[in-house]
Amino acid sequence: MKGACPGVEVSGVDADPWMLATAVAKAKRAGVEATFTRGFAESLPYPDGAFDRVVSGLFFHHLAPDAKAAALREAARVLVPGGEIHVADWGRPSGPLLRLLFLGVRLLDGFGNTAAHAAGRLPVLVEEAGFAGVRTHARFATAFGTLDVLSGVKPAEASA
């Protein structure tokens, strides 16, 4: 991301110290300057309106439904008005074989955590968190199910 957009400031957050260390090592190998912070998606350690973009990859399916909703609301909170969320995560399997493959993910991460994904409801959850213009840009068949790439925009604040 930073290579495609020189001058962008990159921040990463994860609750797992091992994942943070892995991210730091990957950034260092790639020669990318980034800031990594330990924290939880449901209570991000950043002020309101701190970012222009929030990007998440294969994260939301790990969360329980209430935590998923809280994390999406937090993403909206830390975005500036007009800021964008970009998510790549599991979506509704696009056929019987992909439904069967996705069963492995559901067994590992929990049927409750992945129910909204299996039903294709992640875009609805993003909208319910306050994002507008939510759309799915691409769907990819993988060895573990169907990966959806979607985005939404935090609406501009209403003028008084």
Where are these regions (language model features)?
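Class I SAM-dependent methyltransferase SAM/SAH-binding core
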Residues: 1-43
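A short SAM/SAH-binding and catalytic strip from SAM-dependent methyltransferases
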Residues: 53-67
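A short acidic, Gly/Pro-enriched loop at the edge of an enzyme's catalytic core
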Residues: 42-54
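Conserved Rossmann-like nucleotide-binding pocket used by diverse enzymes
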Residues: 11, 37, 54-55, 86
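A short glycine-rich, Lys/Arg-flanked "PGG" loop and its adjoining helix->strand segment in the class I
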Residues: 69-81
